[in-house]
């Protein structure tokens, strides 16, 4: 054992032992309780960031603690390796996405290994490899057979210059991110999955999940189950009688309709725009906008009157039809009723274009004005219908029932349950993804690839150039034979949404070498006992993975219908930001490591200068670490300088896992100092700690009893904190332990050995390298086996017993001191001790005790 703690040497030695022992390979064992903990697999972007370090350390701590408690634990890892960033990098560097991806995986895997993570690498999954995505294709075909997958036209963003489809995030202010061309909306055939078929189950099953309430609420709102009325506004056009259908959750406001708005893609819009260039120009403008719902929510609401009217379904009055840029064809019926008096968006639209505003809901005693928006119908319990003819005076529920009944009687509508959730469009007009296993035959149409011909292998040697899909230009991939008729045919060139890849990888971890999609091992490990990832995945990834599990269950592949029992969404890692702004308003961001900050006498930052030129920079505040703000910390530099254990200790100590973590260089230094203290104590006391001698706890000297009482008391709290995932207080407990052990005077070697051994085991899940090496160097491994498999220390309840207890002493309700009494002291003895105490005499000032209040085990209050 070396006197000096050298993290690089310690960590290399520990990792060498773990590799030699194949320490983290997990096997199924029906006789042991399993614990399957998974961190959301990373995208291989090139390097780990501190968010990764925090996530994986949380997972690792959980794994090690539960393994010490006898669980059969598994912590796997893989790579979410398909996706657009690889294509962008390929275009920038002139290399195939495959090369860029595999190089990044190799580097990031090396980084993970340097962290000492308890990963079973024999289960590694890489989603861009054919042995994985074969099963994406296989399940897609099964879903196609069952009608869970289907084909229809869908709207996409089309860049007319680059001749390619753009993701929503690639459309910036209505233009393509590379070409700058005005983006168009296009309707193209795409494949969808019927997630809506599972909407109620996805909603109801949320109640049984141990997930953060925030995530459950987000999914609940995304699914968006609504109870309302679907009805139509009658109209006649080209000699045909039709209905302009809408859905509303507020049928009680129908009498307040003053206009209808339809989407630019609505069939009625195209018909009304014939021979109307201005109307067609507005439709074209709408189609150039993004197709994301978020874009619609934030964009300026604009519309154009069509000059056409439909009839109000209850009054027969004409209702003007507008085309609105805020109406989505993909939601509802592609048309909405405009009730400006009782809908804020409609109110703004009506004020902008001078449309009538008709109040039809009121609360008695309240005054209404059309000058500014008011929540006129927010109070459903007190509001009643007004200006609504025979419905006047009806409350919300009664009005909805009556109006729905009249619409139904007239054949115009009825009550309906709808969902905000839409079917999952999985087609992507991109190269770097799972090929959709469909062949297009001139004679047979769309033909599924036969199961025996799977996987349809994606060529890995193509380099995208930004002009269309490389697969469409690859004869070797594109040209094939129809499996039905044998004629020349073409492969589908769309690939699958990368959310397909991440929808089930955790099931493949359980059986990575299976010759089927999954096998019996999957039902042993799944569902995950703990899933860990960022809140940003609350909706899409987590919702799709829940859907995928239910589909796999219904196909008889697995026994479970939910992929994760428990979910932890770790907080973001934050750091200071610094910038300079030029005359044009452009900001240049500087890394905190390149800046010197000055503070006032209260420790608040008051200024900063750039180290390289000594000139001031602006303080931008604390924000999430990101490339855009240049405020990240390179984990590899941290590990190289301080060691992985210091990085792990800081990230666990700085904040509870679910809360945001503010980066602190001083905190990292503090973590490093603490580990040096742990090592230094072990080295300085190595001879005493090597003493293996039994002891009779009851016969120990008071100093030994005091030390054991403190250590076992802190151990009890640390055990509780590990179970509730409060790792920051676990580290605090370990620090208390070290303080107690260092401060113990006259302790016998055997007691010192016991208590230091408890400290090493409490710290081990957080800092496995240094504790593993100390455990071995000080002979604990010879006695108990390697720390990898050492059992969690048991609390000695007898050690917590005290002959004396300390009570708070109060005089007239104010704390005046402390009173030590025998643990089993009678009330009379406590009262006598209180009035005899010197602090009572001092503050009573000669006055006798009138009343003595004793709260057992806590305090004694003497009233004078």
Curated annotation (Swiss-Prot):
It comes from the Bacteria. It is an enzyme of class 6 (ligase). A motif ('HIGH' region) lies at residues 42-52. Coiled coil: none annotated. The keyword ATP-binding applies. GO terms for cellular component: cytosol. GO terms for molecular function: aminoacyl-tRNA deacylase activity; ATP binding; leucine-tRNA ligase activity. CDD domains: Anticodon_Ia_Leu_BEm, LeuRS_core. It catalyses: tRNA(Leu) + L-leucine + ATP = L-leucyl-tRNA(Leu) + AMP + diphosphate. This is Leucine--tRNA ligase. It comes from Burkholderia pseudomallei (strain 1710b). The lineage of its organism: Bacteria, Pseudomonadati, Pseudomonadota, Betaproteobacteria, Burkholderiales.
